């Protein structure tokens, strides 16, 4: 759910307040859009009543609101790898879930690389070093990376619990000494690593977060509902590009084998009702590879590996007009 602290009169009042002196009541589209941005910055996202059942949530919102139906939502063809980049645009190359299988990937031309997590199998330092070497071999001007549930050593609370409980479900990770993993992020010297943090490149504000709904007790897992919402509430308004490891509800989150939607309802409401980024990149659900759009945000599930962990899905290319202030 979401609610707002404003009533219908606020849009008119804020648009009027944003008018230059002497223009009276002549509302331009830019003033109305500015007022709408003010409105969205005041939206408060609450835990959805269907939070614990994303498949039911999808059905409810689709039937009652048409929220996932054309023309509101549609599949989108990614930019061909050999297409020329339009003047004044920045080319983003999006990948996710490479799982230490980067050798077969044919990386296309671009300006900024985005990796949405699961670049290793278990987050072992040796895997991170190998991934960092691969990053260093790539020619992109910027390389932005977040962790996923497979980067176990990047989740310090997970590691503390793992060692404390003497739990050997992940034996190779459990045997690591704290000094081997406490600063594992420092091994990523060839990229910008984001974890509930933001960076601005080429004028684009980019925010990254690794969290996702509980998934068999891996890294960066949180219960659906309030715990995840608190993480999404950290995402600031005005972000141009959002990177999360898991998908929002209804966008490239379908798991055919289980006949279930597995995306996060609170992430969907945060993206659509409050943040409204131009681009949202994620992975995690290997079966969901592809691109969708809702008229405001382009959603990219950039999972390179299939459900059988074969690295056959090509990187997804997205061109965005470069902000004028870059």
Swiss-Prot record:
Gene3D superfamilies: 3.60.21.10. GO terms for molecular function: hydrolase activity. Keywords: Hydrolase. Expressed predominantly in adult brain. Its EC number is 3.1.-.-. May have metallophosphoesterase activity (in vitro). Belongs to the UPF0046 family. This is Metallophosphoesterase domain-containing protein 1. It comes from Homo sapiens. The lineage of its organism: Eukaryota, Metazoa, Chordata, Craniata, Vertebrata. The gene is MPPED1.
